[in-house]
């Protein structure tokens, strides 16, 4: 399943072939932040759903990146340490933040699909 899933916090998730889940922030989120100047990546450890795993700082603000599901972070995108601008340049690709192994692999499917996320964005724009 390589279909993207999303959170209401504007994070995207992609299940990889090995069962790990890659996490990043959406184009909407990086646009709202503006130019990203620093990314604090998570430690390789277990995090509970909703806990702050990472921080992204921009010229406008600092924002937390929250663990979308309970699981163990197994890899971080070290490129972001030297090139945080990748979050702006390619938020859904090279600008990914971390990969984790979810405690419940099926829980990913309960997150927003593309249509549901698009409705969320429309509701935000209408508000």
Curated annotation (Swiss-Prot):
One GO CC term on file: glycine cleavage complex
Known partners and oligomeric status: The glycine cleavage system is composed of four proteins: P, T, L and H.
Primary role: The glycine cleavage system catalyzes the degradation of glycine. The H protein shuttles the methylamine group of glycine from the P protein to the T protein.
Positions of post-translational N6-lipoyllysine modification: 60
PANTHER family the UniProt entry points to: GLYCINE CLEAVAGE SYSTEM H PROTEIN, GLYCINE CLEAVAGE SYSTEM H PROTEIN-RELATED
Domain Lipoyl-binding intervals: 20-101
Cofactor(s) required for function per UniProt: (R)-lipoate
Disulfide bond annotation, renumbered to this chain: none
Similarity comment: family membership: Belongs to the GcvH family.
Organism: Pseudomonas putida (strain ATCC 47054 / DSM 6125 / CFBP 8728 / NCIMB 11950 / KT2440)
Keywords: Lipoyl
Name used for this protein in its record: Glycine cleavage system H protein 1
InterPro entries: Biotin_lipoyl, GCV_H, GCV_H/Fam206, GCV_H_sub, Single_hybrid_motif
Note on cofactor: Binds 1 lipoyl cofactor covalently.
GO BP field: glycine decarboxylation via glycine cleavage system
NCBIfam families noted in UniProt: gcvH, PRK01202.1
């Amino acid at each position: 399943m390589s279909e993207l899933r999303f959170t209401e916090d504007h994070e995207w998730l992609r299940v990889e072939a090995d069962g790990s889940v890659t996490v990043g922030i959406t184009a909407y989120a990086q646009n709202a932040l503006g130019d990203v100047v620093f990314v604090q990546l998570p430690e390789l450890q277990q995090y509970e759903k909703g806990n702050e795993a990472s921080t992204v700082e921009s010229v406008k603000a600092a924002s937390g990146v929250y663990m979308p599901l309970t699981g163990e972070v197994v890899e971080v995108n070290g490129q972001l340490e030297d090139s945080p601008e990748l979050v702006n340049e390619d938020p859904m690709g090279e600008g990914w933040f971390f990969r984790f192994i979810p405690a419940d692999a099926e829980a990913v499917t309960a997150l927003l699909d593309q249509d549901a996320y698009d409705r969320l964005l429309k509701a935000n724009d209408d508000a």
